[in-house]
Amino acid sequence: MNEAVIDPILETAVNTGDMFCSQTIPNRCLKDTILIEVQPECADTLQCVLDDKVSRHQPLLLRNHKKLELPSEKSVTRGGFYMQQLELLVKSAPPNEYALLLIQCKDTALADEDNFFVANGVIDAGYRGVISALLYYRPGVTVILPGHLTIYLFPVKLRQSRLLPKNVLKHLDPIFKSIQVQPLSNSPSNYEKPVISEFADISTVQQGQPLHRDSAEYHIDVPLTYKHIINPKRQEDAGYDICVPYNLYLKRNEFIKIVLPIIRDWDLQHPSINAYIFGRSSKSRSGIIVCPTAWPAGEHCKFYVYNLTGDDIRIKTGDRLAQVLLIDHNTQIHLKHNVLSNIAFPYAIRGKCGIPGVQWYFTKTLDLIATPSERGTRGFGSTDKETNDVDFLLKH
């Protein structure tokens, strides 16, 4: 059973200035232990507790205990929504083999919960800054009542793959030239650029079946080879970055499906891994929403993208659009492990997810006792140089 622990000896040692002040806790002491530091001001706005609706292996639950008046001065427009970055006033330090998912949690069918949403987030083990959530809500929402905004910090145990990203296409030609692309049938009409890619059957050099038979077909060249589509990662990073292999054009409010020439075959002999695709925080904040989804074994890398920036945009070749997480199959998250999802803001049902058996360790001195981190407090795109990789083609 996972527990919330505050070690009085450790806290005293840190606060009285003996050896723990200049040393971190040995890694062996942090195995399957997630350090949490709750900022003092959190008590003014948020309740931070282990979820008592889960009998064992409890996720961390954050809930507003004061009403949240909207829109605030921090809100910005994102398509047909307002978006606001909410500081949750919590820091974390999981071991490198873990990550935290930030997910909206629902336990009752409250009517107003269909009017505001929390973008799914991935908290890397190396992130030491204050965790934030991205709140999207409809223009008519003026208040979120106490207890109606509930968020899980949900630990997942990661798996490593030596073959990703090196040999994921060992049975296919690694260079792709002719690729079929089509707009979705419900995309805005008269748009000059194709926005959805469906790849040819490379192994037989035959075109794949079009997704919509009434759609026009195009072909484009892909300048990147497969080894540049999925990037390597640092040990403290949760996911492998997924890059777009060509300039991607999205009209405002466009909802598209991306199919990349990567087949998940590296772990067909190792069914202990489930793969999931999530968006990147910098993209979600700008209004480019990658719908979180599973990546089933034996299938191409597919995911949906929703352009809520309010503008027509171009995402440049090589830009990091999404990330793939390899998660231990015993971890039951809010997404089905074998279904392609097109839901922009999926949420968890309270008490229905199964987290790994971790121990939560609450401390007031996380920066002193956590293992060193390369990323530190930099977040929301700090690992990217993305500011010039998205062109806004039409301003409103």
Swiss-Prot record:
It catalyses: dUTP + H2O = dUMP + diphosphate + H(+). GO terms for biological process: dUTP metabolic process. One of its GO terms (molecular function) is metal ion binding. Gene3D superfamilies: 2.70.40.10. Its EC number is 3.6.1.23. Keywords: Hydrolase, Magnesium, Metal-binding, Nucleotide metabolism. InterPro entries: dUTPase-like, dUTPase-like_sf, HSV_DUT. Substrate binds at R280, S281, S282, F380, G381. Involved in nucleotide metabolism: produces dUMP, the immediate precursor of thymidine nucleotides and decreases the intracellular concentration of dUTP to avoid uracil incorporation into viral DNA. Belongs to the dUTPase family. This is Deoxyuridine 5'-triphosphate nucleotidohydrolase. The gene is DUT.
